[in-house]
């Protein structure tokens, strides 16, 4: 993809720097606080994805998530397998109506629709990502089985009992309130059917009184557009409070033969995911610097690159210390 022309998403190029400054002000390193982020989550998350999506797609591809990974397996292969695993856990059948909550540009929904021969609706509140996702649907020839709806997942525009299955891949972490989000998912899911998710969470090893732990948490929050990273136990409580029966749950990061954060580790090198390596990120950072200098990229692009790099450092440190996971998995059922 053309990184330079897409930087800033739907934000006018002349307004990108102002958007970056406003986004940064939501976060603790720039004087922000959790209450403000939660109160303004729609604005914060939209600014984040307008600013960051082009970087994500350039470095990560169409599926913006981590994955359990086997030795000898490429990052791309592991990402597909991670998506297939979720679809199999849900038991999605051909022709069923499925909802992807917080679908990004639709990489997982296209993969799951093809894998299960189902009809998948992607829910997203970011206009740029939906525009990009529709273009990718057209290029992939899946317009009839994959579609997008622009809406807030805290206030879904669907009738009760609309979907045969619902899933979220590293997306509902953007919700200001887990219970409110899960309750909406419960409402639109048909009775007897299941909801599965990979959640970003702090683990039981996280110590809120440890300054280094809080620094890592803050780095992940600013670099990934998050109001607050919840504990795994809080997600589980919210699920049950929303009415779900939890079939099983587990932090899948614990069983990954290859660390999930390896693609971002500065000590790791891979030709198959070169753009994510330290060398690849260094090249991208300097390319953006040059593009901004010669005005092919909007002012503020370097600062986006900087807070994404800050996120990478926080994710690796959080993964190494086992205080953070991007794959707290659960499968939950709405009672009949």
UniProtKB/Swiss-Prot annotation:
One GO CC term on file: plasmodesma
Residues annotated with N-acetylmethionine modification: 1
A GO biological-process term: embryo development ending in seed dormancy
Example of a GO MF term: sterol 24-C-methyltransferase activity
CDD domains per UniProt: AdoMet_MTases (cd02440)
Protein EC: 2.1.1.41
Pathway membership, UniProt: Steroid biosynthesis; sterol biosynthesis
One of the Pfam families matching this protein, by short name: Sterol_MT_C
PROSITE patterns: SAM_MT_ERG6_SMT
Family: Belongs to the class I-like SAM-binding methyltransferase superfamily. Erg6/SMT family.
Protein name: Cycloartenol-C-24-methyltransferase
Organism, scientific name: Arabidopsis thaliana
